[in-house]
Amino acid sequence: MIWHVQNENFILDSTRIFMKAFHLLLFDGSLIVPECILIFGLILLLMIDSTSDQKDIPWLYFISSTSLVMSITALLFRWREEPVISFSGNFQTNNFNEIFQFLILLCSTLCIPLSVEYIECTEMAITEFLLFVLTATLGGMFLCGANDLITIFVAPECFSLCSYLLSGYTKKDVRSNEATMKYLLMGGASSSILVHGFSWLYGSSGGEIELQEIVNGLINTQMYNSPGISIALIFITVGIGFKLSPAPSHQWTPDVYEGSPTPVVAFLSVTSKVAASASATRIFDIPFYFSSNEWHLLLETLAILSMILGNLIAITQTSMKRMLAYSSIGQIGYVIIGIIVGDSNDGYASMITYMLFYISMNLGTFACIVLFGLRTGTDNIRDYAGLYTKDPFLALSLALCLLSLGGLPPLAGFFGKLYLFWCGWQAGLYFLVLIGLLTSVVSIYYYLKIIKLLMTGRTQEITPHVRNYRRSPFRSNNSIELSMIVCVIASTIPGISMNPIIAIAQDTLF
């Protein structure tokens, strides 16, 4: 009799849970249409892979790219709608979140054509690669819209697990295995630190998990200036720091960049920073509203360390990918300036604008590295000497992207840094802006050093890799070159469209 009653209660509870889930999906499902499109694309990929042969490989690329483009389209149709909190407070839909989701989708859309020839040449498993990329993109999108502590923890784990698998995709490469192990161990440690910080925030607010409710809970419990909040702030900053990879949380970055397949590095170098920046902005600005002085000081320290260490250590590197790893550490220091400035002086708008330009500059550089690596089999900076004499198109493209990363006018990087530093100066961050300007000059030095190698014509400096380099026509149907051309154009002629870009970014307010 007791068993019968318990069984009936279990059935009733299961029915209630199912009906609640169905109700949420029915009424709130329209708010996650872009994410649902990606999920549908993932299901299609699995179905085609399990029911077809190798001749249908082009369909896999087509479905992946189409699902990303359709997701971008759905996101744009939803633009400028009123902010909505859905799924019982798990997600928030607003312009700020959506523009970061757009940037993540843009990164993935550009990374897939960048990877096609590399995957074919290295004979990597195609379906799994595309599945991991789309799933990581999905995790990044959910992270941008996350509105409670549980979702903010689960969404980056979805992204991180796919990142670990992608970084170790070349299983026979010892460097890749070593990089993956470091990435996995440090990722697990950072996740533990992050969730420990969340537990302090949860307890101090009286058991609240939604970001805005945490603020209300801290006011009700009078704990907004307590030591527990300071402890939570430190742990959460360390946990998020792993995703952003500023100094001193950057130890995994150079090894993962050097050991992972180059298209994977290109994907991780932009998507992880975009998603983590969106999450960090919301976490610091909402739950830690009353501790703004403390987290400003923490982020200022991270920004200074990142800009100085990243750019100084990059000078000494001999590997192109390792140099870009340290360069990215310096770049995230510039982005942190926008987070610190906040909404009051267009800080978020400047951060978003710079992120958009950084995506094009960084992916353009990695597209050039992928092409050079496939044609020569080397990643050493010294082996780029004299590339202009063999492939002027590739050499000029790489030079333009590097100069844009350095911030030379009239390229995209210059306008992005100018807007970012100007907002920082208006907010009174004079020391940070001066450090940013000085380290930008340092970055220009090591970028120009590479460009000098590219343009050299002296025979004694040209290595056998370039001497035996296969010439490439100016016009090509190569998907990597097409992706590279798009990124190079976006990195070189932004001045014409700066005003509308800034205007759109300024609309992305809370």
UniProtKB/Swiss-Prot annotation:
Q: Which HAMAP family match?
A: NDH1_NuoN_1
User: What PANTHER family does this protein's entry cite?
Assistant: NADH DEHYDROGENASE
The molecule here is called NAD(P)H-quinone oxidoreductase subunit 2 A, chloroplastic
Catalytic activity, as annotated: a plastoquinone + NADH + (n+1) H(+)(in) = a plastoquinol + NAD(+) + n H(+)(out); a plastoquinone + NADPH + (n+1) H(+)(in) = a plastoquinol + NADP(+) + n H(+)(out)
- EC supergroup of this enzyme: translocase
Biological process terms from the Gene Ontology for this record are: ATP synthesis coupled electron transport; photosynthesis, light reaction
Q: How does it sit in the membrane?
A: Multi-pass membrane protein
According to its UniProt entry, the function of this protein is described as: NDH shuttles electrons from NAD(P)H:plastoquinone, via FMN and iron-sulfur (Fe-S) centers, to quinones in the photosynthetic chain and possibly in a chloroplast respiratory chain. The immediate electron acceptor for the enzyme in this species is believed to be plastoquinone. Couples the redox reaction to proton translocation, and thus conserves the redox energy in a proton gradient.
What residue intervals traverse the membrane?
Answer: 24-44, 57-77, 99-119, 124-144, 149-169, 183-203, 227-247, 295-315, 323-343, 354-374, 395-415, 418-438, 484-504
This protein's superkingdom? Answer: Eukaryota
Q: What is its main location?
A: plastid
Instruction: Outline the subunit composition.
Output: NDH is composed of at least 16 different subunits, 5 of which are encoded in the nucleus.
Q: Where in the cell is it found?
A: Plastid, Chloroplast thylakoid membrane
Q: Which GO terms describe its molecular function?
A: NADH dehydrogenase (ubiquinone) activity; quinone binding
Q: What is this enzyme's EC?
A: 7.1.1.-
Q: Which InterPro entries match?
A: NADH-Q_OxRdtase_suN/2, ND/Mrp_TM, Ndh2_N
Q: Which UniProt key words apply to this protein? A: Chloroplast, Membrane, NAD, NADP, Plastid, Plastoquinone, Quinone, Thylakoid, Translocase, Transmembrane, Transmembrane helix, Transport
Q: Which organism is it from?
A: Daucus carota
One Pfam match, given by its short name, reads Proton_antipo_M
Family the UniProt entry places it in: Belongs to the complex I subunit 2 family.
